[in-house]
Amino acid sequence: MLLPACLRRCARLLFWIPVLVVIVVVMWSYYAYVVHFCWILLSSATQRVVFLCLFHLCFGMFSWSFWKAVSTPPSSPSVEFQFSTSDSLLYELERDDVAKSPILLEISQKLPVHTRTATGAIRFCHHCQLIKPDRCHHCSVCQTCVLKMDHHCLWLNNCMGFSNYKFFMLFLLYSLLYCLLIVSTVTPTVIQLWRGRLFDSCVKLHVLFLTLVSAIFAITLCFLLIFHIWLLTSNKTTLEWLSVPFFANGPGSKAFDVGVQANFLQVFGKKKRLWLFPVFSSEGDGHSFPLSCQMSSHGPPVMNGHERCATLRTVASPKEAAVTIAVD
């Protein structure tokens, strides 16, 4: 028992290596840009001040969003979704999955749960002993169920979900701006270095490598940010993109899509002044989400005939019409 526990601790430490790699690369880029580029290569004091101000603004917002994405723990389901001792005993006594289904169904009747497994059963986590809320998944790395789980990010050593997805989006945005700023401001100097007008080999190496690394990261981050913007405006998670969520009557690829604006507000909130800052402002509690009455493009309607359909909620703003929501 002692050895596996020790191995688990060592594995947790190894998970921090990618985070340290990111920190080291960013700190080196800070050194290369501020010292080698701004202080050594730039001759114009005005240009130096402007570049340093813009750089530190991007660096500050990047660092803030990075820290929030790394340090904010993923939200787990509340106590009401967890099995009581008696429920667990009753559930474990049944060895057949068919016999267990009525137990899960009875307990889930009191909960706002609409998603199902591909076979139509109630989604249950055997590790955490709880009924999974809609869009909740168990992370094998974090060893817990995560509300509205998007993915486990290797470079942040954290699960991206309901509590920190906004921070992840801002992290991508400010990372891209950080790289683009470096590329756009350093490129003219790189051209001079290429033409041989600057001869310091150490400075040349740092600046050339800085531009190359920043350009590569900028291209990668651009595609990643575009992908997550599409997910955000479609109200999908990465896991839902990979595997369509199922409901009582079948799959629902657009079940949570309540319109681009409302989808955006679910993550970033209604307070516009907080949109660009890594401060939590998402709507809801992460356990239940508005459902669209729009038909699934690859399956039957996302609604259950034994339950109510047409529950009205105001999703975007009081000035807009209420969105009709089908409760499965």
Swiss-Prot record:
Q: Name one Pfam family in it.
A: DHHC
The primary site where this protein sits is: Golgi
What is its membrane topology?
A: Multi-pass membrane protein
Reactions that this protein is recorded to catalyse: L-cysteinyl-[protein] + hexadecanoyl-CoA = S-hexadecanoyl-L-cysteinyl-[protein] + CoA; L-cysteinyl-[protein] + tetradecanoyl-CoA = S-tetradecanoyl-L-cysteinyl-[protein] + CoA; L-cysteinyl-[protein] + octadecanoyl-CoA = S-octadecanoyl-L-cysteinyl-[protein] + CoA
- GO terms for biological process? peptidyl-L-cysteine S-palmitoylation; protein localization to membrane; protein targeting to Golgi apparatus
Task: Give a GO cellular-component term.
Answer: postsynaptic density
The EC number of this protein is 2.3.1.225, 2.3.1.-
Q: Which residues lie on this side of the membrane: Cytoplasmic?
A: 1-14, 70-166, 228-328
User: Which residues act catalytically here?
Assistant: 153 (s-palmitoyl cysteine intermediate)
- PTM remark: Autopalmitoylated (in vitro).
* Binding, Zn(2+) 2: 139, 142, 152, 159
Residues exposed to the Lumenal side:
36-48, 188-206
Q: Which UniProt keywords apply?
A: Acyltransferase, Golgi apparatus, Lipoprotein, Membrane, Metal-binding, Palmitate, Synapse, Transferase, Transmembrane, Transmembrane helix, Zinc
Q: Where, in this chain's numbering, is substrate bound?
A: 132
* Domain statement: The DHHC domain is required for palmitoyltransferase activity.
Family as reported in the entry's similarity comment: Belongs to the DHHC palmitoyltransferase family.
The protein's name is Palmitoyltransferase ZDHHC15A
Name the lineage: Eukaryota, Metazoa, Chordata, Craniata, Vertebrata
